[in-house]
């Protein structure tokens, strides 16, 4: 059986990250959406996205006529959903209890026909979905814990140098090849995951929940608070709190990053900081690119930053800022 993760029209709620890639590449917790599904299904899934992005993803299923299992990319996977999908027969669909589409087994290739399906061949199950870019920050701590449980069930943590201080070590996992010298890791309030060949320099202090991806670097005296996920090949420093760096991005110097999501291949120049609370402590509005209107989202929000964006040194970013892809920010 081939499994295909599908970007649905509601992908627009994930702007600016959905501008340059499929939702399957969005990171929350330890993994991207695709990595999480692939691990659960024990195979490499394919991606079905909008036309201008489809060329980025190999999709041999489009040239074939076999039955394919299509899966809503925003559905949060678990064993019960996996079992329900594997039990679908050709022509059957799986929905949540509110009628939201989760999966279908069909030879159809037109997404509209896939979503409609046969009204008499639909099964239901309880499911949760990722609904927007800002929702990623709200669920990151929960997803880190869920992913961490899978990691410790399938592997053993690396022993570390005695110069490090580990608080609640049973809640800390350090992957093969990681280097830690003179670091403080406090997992009392949530798990800490350190990926393969990651580097944590002297004096760094980290409180969970926290994820550091493969070959990522934490520089000296960095101060990191949960829930924070740092993707592969990132370099981080300064102070970071409750944020997600998707991967291949740098926030390497002093400055504050809080309640924010940074896309791939971004760079925050030295001294760059964002505000995450208004002086009035009042509600924050952030731009909704899809609806062309302002959404009120609570009293804490930093910035959403699209892929390939660069910040000059000493940039100061307003509360609730929405920055698109490939932007250059000065001041």
Please provide the spans of the model-predicted regions:
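Terminal amphipathic alpha-helical/low-complexity segments used for targeting or macromolecular assembly
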Residues: 1-171, 177
């Amino acid at each position: 059986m081939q499994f295909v993760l599908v970007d649905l029209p509601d992908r627009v709620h994930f702007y600016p990250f959905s501008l340059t890639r499929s939702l399957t590449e969005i990171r929350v917790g330890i993994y991207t959406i695709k990595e999480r599904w692939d691990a659960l299904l024990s195979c490499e899934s394919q991606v079905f996205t909008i036309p201008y992005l489809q060329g980025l993803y190999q999709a041999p299923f489009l040239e074939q006529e076999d039955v394919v299992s299509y899966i809503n990319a925003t559905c949060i996977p678990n064993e019960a959903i996996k079992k329900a999908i594997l039990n679908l027969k050709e022509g059957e669909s799986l929905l949540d209890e509110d009628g939201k589409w989760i999966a279908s087994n069909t030879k159809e290739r037109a997404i509209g026909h896939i979503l409609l399906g046969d009204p008499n061949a639909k099964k239901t199950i309880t499911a949760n979905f990722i609904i927007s870019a800002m929702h990623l920050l709200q669920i990151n701590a929960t997803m880190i814990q869920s992913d961490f449980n899978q990691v410790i069930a399938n592997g053993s943590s690396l022993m570390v140098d005695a110069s490090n201080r580990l608080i609640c070590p049973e809640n800390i996992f350090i992957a093969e090849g990681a280097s830690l010298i003179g670091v403080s890791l406090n997992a009392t309030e949530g798990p800490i995951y350190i990926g393969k060949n990651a580097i944590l320099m002297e004096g760094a202090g980290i409180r969970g929940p926290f994820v550091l991806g493969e070959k990522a670097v934490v520089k000296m005296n960095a101060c990191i608070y949960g829930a924070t996920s740092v993707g592969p090949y990132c370099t981080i420093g300064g102070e970071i709190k409750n944020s997600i760096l998707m991967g291949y991005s740098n926030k390497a110097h002093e400055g504050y990053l809080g309640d924010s999501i940074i896309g791939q291949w971004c760079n925050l120049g030295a001294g760059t900081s964002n505000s995450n609370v208004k002086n009035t402590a009042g509600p924050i509005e952030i731009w909704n690119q899809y609806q062309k209107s302002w959404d009120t989202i609570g009293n804490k929000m930093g910035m959403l930053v699209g892929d390939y964006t660069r910040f000059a040194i000493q940039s100061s970013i307003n509360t609730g800022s929405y920055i698109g892809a490939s932007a250059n920010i000065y001041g």
